[in-house]
A protein has these predicted regions:
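Glycine- and acidic-residue-biased ligand/ion/polar-headgroup-sensing regions
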Residues: 97-109, 114
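Bacterial N-terminal signal peptides that target proteins for export
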Residues: 1-9
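Conserved short histidine dyad/triad with adjacent acidic residue
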Residues: 63-67, 80-95
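Short acidic-glycine-tyrosine-enriched beta hairpin
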Residues: 115-131
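Ligand-binding loop in jelly-roll beta-barrel domains
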Residues: 74, 110, 130-156
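Bacterial N-terminal signal peptides
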Residues: 8-18
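A short, N-terminal "cap"/entry segment at the start of jelly-roll beta-barrel domains
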Residues: 23-76, 164-194
Length: 194
């Protein structure tokens, strides 16, 4: 019994000393966003509409940013949904710093992935390794509901800059604005020149 009491006393002293000492924070910890668990219904999230751009003056597709550094605080991935209207497309582009998984919930599309082209239908999954060219054309009679997951944040910042929140005035981007946004976010997305 005598051995146990000194051990308990030493432990109690160590606990008191450790709880009264200020914790040193690492510089890296200051930049980690606060994560928040989320449960979102189909149409919940940050709803946005792509602004028109040179050669495409009409407002673009509707998309929803569901999980990213701003929504949920994820520092590791981005999850979004988008509707590709009948006759619409995702223009040829690549993501230098992130893999992407594209899941087409509905519709019919012609997908160009690297050197491969294929017609796919609702329920199809497309894995797009970083730096691989991708484009999608809606060739069906209905809108395509698409889900995209990126392995690293970045692209969502470009999407925010080139869109407006649903309900806001949607003014097309000027050529200068579009070029500046593409240059600023070239680490996350590069579009093929027409």
């Amino acid at each position: 019994m005598r051995i146990v009491r000194p051990s308990i006393a030493v432990c109690a002293i160590l606990v008191c000393v450790n709880t009264s000492a200020p914790l040193a924070s690492s510089p890296q910890a200051a930049h980690v966003p606060q994560t928040t668990p989320l449960i979102l219904e189909k149409d919940e999230g940050e709803r946005r509409i792509v602004r028109g751009w040179p050669g495409h003056p009409d407002p673009g597709e509707t998309f929803i940013l569901k999980v990213d550094p701003k929504n949920g605080g994820s520092s590791h991935l981005v999850f979004m949904t988008a509707d590709i209207r009948r006759g619409g497309a995702i223009d040829p582009h690549r993501h230098p710093g992130a893999d992407e998984i594209l899941f087409l919930e509905s519709g019919t599309a012609r997908v160009h992935l690297g050197d491969t082209a294929r017609v796919v239908h609702g329920g199809s999954t497309v894995f797009i390794p970083a730096n691989t060219w991708i484009s999608v054309d809606n060739i069906g009679n209905e809108a395509i509901r698409a889900v995209a997951v990126f392995s690293a944040p970045g692209f969502e910042q470009f999407m925010r800059e080139t869109s407006v929140l649903e309900g806001e005035k949607n003014v097309p981007l000027t050529k200068a604005e579009n070029d500046a946004a593409e240059k600023r976010h070239s680490h996350a997305v590069i579009y093929k020149e027409p």
